Amino acid sequence: MVDQVKVVADEQAPTEQSLRRNLTNRHIQLIAIGGAIGTGLFMGSGKTISLAGPSIIFVYMIIGFMLFFVMRAMGELLLSNLEYKSFSDFAADLLGPWAGYFTGWTYWFCWVVTGMADVVAITAYAQFWFPGLSDWVASLAVILLLLGLNLATVKMFGEMEFWFAMIKIVAIVALIVVGLVMVLMHFQSPTGVEASFAHLWNDGGWFPKGISGFFAGFQIAVFAFVGIELVGTTAAETKDPEKSLPRAINSIPIRIIMFYVFALIVIMSVTPWSSVVPSKSPFVELFVLVGLPAAGLINFVVLTSAASSANSGVFSTSRMLFGLAQDGQAPKMFAKLSKRAVPAKGLTFSCMCLLGGVVMLMVNPSVIAAFTMITTVSAILFMFVWTIILCSYLAYRRKRPQLHEQSKYKMPLGKLMCWVCMAFFVFVLVLLTLEADTREALMVTPLWFVLLGAGWLFAGKKRLAK
């Protein structure tokens, strides 16, 4: 299965089954950062602040803490066997072919749905500069651009993600710096409110909405971390993975503190949490207070953030299809690479699915309600993927203790933290039953596994036998 796949270095001529290690440490670090900073931070943080107040800071820290251990488990597994292309490979190897099948296709589905949402968002943001541009023309242009750039080389994907992530970083650092200056200079808003760190505890304390508000924050905040595992799909195309992957994963806590915690502290220090409008971006509102041309600036940042997410989706779905096809769990055509060592057919198929979904949304706006539920289902399914990573780690510790002993990148508190993280995911699922919209999505989620199960029984096993 996995050992049949050979990953060659850049200077070697690729074969039909080889991926090139063209992603450098610089690419991997920024891909990891880009994966950890979603569009939700820019657009959804207003809602999370209004739900939980200052306690939202602890919510992001707790989720980030848990996911750091998921990423450490993934890192140790990927480095235990450099033949692994992604987490679906080690799931198949350690838990059985069914696990690779369910993980690979679930991850593919998650990113296709997320990609559709991103493309629709990009077309909406593009209206800011091109108000007369037709939605379907804009969508087609975006998808063709992403396809064209990804078909070029894996290095092109790395370069795009590098600059997309850099834009997000600059925007967040600018917000933190501007906010700090406003606090230090005792900036006063037009309504007479003075910027101060005291807003964090003076306006009802750290938990103004009580424990229920604190818990409500988890329901939305956990979705902001979707994509944090993306670096795991680059393993087969990373130069010097033994150095690059640990470096990228180890910096996750610093990134979360800087990009989530510091940004939220600054936002709630300049504007008291009770004055934050849920439907508006707190980032935009802060820049508006200073008098900067925030509308165009933030529109550009959020557009590139959505483009980064869509780009990541196109990349990861094609690599998942490639791995599944290599293992006999997807059509053989997806196992073929182009002359540039890119899974071109997988890329084209994923982009066709993106385009089909976007066209359906635009032709029939009534589908949007169902689509909103599907995106929530997709976010829930990401938690399934994270859980499979943890289950794979437990199987690895049980079946291959010698590899763990030899590992230079051991997961801290390995077995214990696997169970703690899985208990946390169960806790989040219980919280999702408390709200009507997320409860409906949770009830629909088993349908995906029924479909996958049918596919496994009728097609997956047969391909595997061949």
Model-found features: residue ranges?
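Membrane-interface "cap" regions at the ends of multi-pass membrane proteins
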Residues: 1-46, 50-55, 68-72, 83-84, ...
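Helix-loop-helix connectors at the membrane interface of multi-pass transporters/channels
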Residues: 4-12, 89-92, 119-139, 171-174, ...
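Helix-loop-helix junctions that connect adjacent transmembrane segments
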Residues: 14-19, 56-57, 131-134, 166-300
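Extracellular loop-to-transmembrane helix junctions
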Residues: 20, 43-138, 254-257, 261, ...
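Membrane-helix boundary/coupling elements in multi-pass transport proteins
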Residues: 83-84, 106-121, 225-238, 293-332, ...
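TM-loop-TM module centered on a large, flexible mid-protein loop between adjacent transmembrane helices
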Residues: 89-92, 96, 128, 201, ...
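Membrane-interface loop-to-helix entry segments
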Residues: 123, 136-195, 226, 249-253, ...
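C-terminal membrane-solvent junction of multi-pass transporters and transport-like membrane proteins
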Residues: 164, 333-344, 383-436
